[in-house]
Amino acid sequence: QKMVQGSKYRFDFATTPGVVKEVIDKIMTEYRQGKHLEKRPRILVTGCPIGGDSLKVIRAIEDNGGVVVAIENCSGVRTLGNPVEEDCEDIYEAIARKYLSTGCSIMTPNDNRIDLIGEIIDEYHVDGVVEMILTGCHATGAESVYIRKFVTEEKHLPYIAVDTDYSTADQGPVSYTHLRAHETLSDL
């Protein structure tokens, strides 16, 4: 949770790498000292941006026995792929190519997002996928049909979509009803 929020909403972007390095150093020190999590289902969280009270989805996963190993969303790893070609003859075309190839749910067809999710599942040895759909994000809600099909039929993993918002009003239902029932957390 601290890692998710630790690098966002900073006005001094120059300090962000230092903050992230501190977190990495702390984690690596604890790892070398033998501090490890017990085996838990490894969960990929995908969908809408996470921050503020929407972190309840991550808390619910981890409070119910899972561990979030990757986040693929509008403000996460999705935006890091396909860097802008700096030596391109037309920099505007290079910028357009970068943003048009981002696997965002408003793009169609959106094979890039499916490919990225597949890569994350393989690289992080994911046991299940939780898609967070914010109320009003109709593009992510509509695309969740394709994500569910890919995850369950091609990757043969459990998938659940959690409809929520940035409030705390549904924290109980998100935690107990949705995620406790998710077969990844209850059966693995």
Regions found by a protein language model. Give the residues of each.
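Flexible internal linker/loop segments at domain or repeat junctions
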Residues: 66, 70-112
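A charged, amphipathic alpha-helical module
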Residues: 1-68, 72-80
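Single conserved hydrophobic/aromatic residue that forms the stacking wall/gate
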Residues: 178-188
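A short, acidic, amphipathic alpha-helical segment used as a generic capping/interface helix at domain edges
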Residues: 108-125, 143-146
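C-terminal regions of proteins
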Residues: 148, 152, 157-180
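Glycine/threonine-rich flexible loop motifs
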Residues: 137-143
